[in-house]
């Protein structure tokens, strides 16, 4: 859950981080309650919906304002996380928060990530040169 963790930390600590990026990240963990042993940390989803709601990136967006973070979201068109990334993109658009949203052919695998890293580096190179 690296992409979720990166965004989670950056949004919660925007006073420390100026930018955040995710490639194939699970931006909303709620559709996947039986995966990655998350219920060990958050409890059973059906019994702890509020806890899950409070621990998913897409709901942290409400605490962001445009300009708080430079954000890049990148996800393959065949990735099982595509829908939650698209949902995050739409939430950011609704809040008028500038961000880069990239989708290309590819899945949740090393081949996609090896290609994606070039876009992430370009994004952060530009960010750090400001």
Model-assigned labels for residue ranges:
Residues 1-130:
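Non-catalytic cap/lid and distal C-terminal segments of serine-dependent acyl enzymes
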């Amino acid at each position: 859950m690296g992409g979720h963790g990166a965004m989670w930390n950056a949004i919660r600590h925007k006073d420390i981080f100026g930018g955040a990026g995710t490639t194939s990240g699970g931006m909303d963990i709620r559709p996947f309650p039986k995966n990655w042993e998350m219920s060990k940390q958050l409890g059973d989803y059906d019994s702890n919906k509020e806890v899950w709601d409070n621990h998913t990136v897409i709901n942290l967006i409400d605490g962001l304002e445009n300009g708080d973070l430079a954000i890049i979201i990148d996800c393959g068109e065949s990735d099982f996380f595509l829908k939650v990334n698209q949902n995050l993109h739409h939430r950011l658009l609704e809040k008028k928060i500038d961000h880069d949203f990239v989708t290309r052919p590819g899945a949740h695998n090393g081949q996609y990530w090896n290609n994606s890293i070039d876009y992430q580096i370009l994004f952060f190179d530009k960010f750090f040169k400001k």
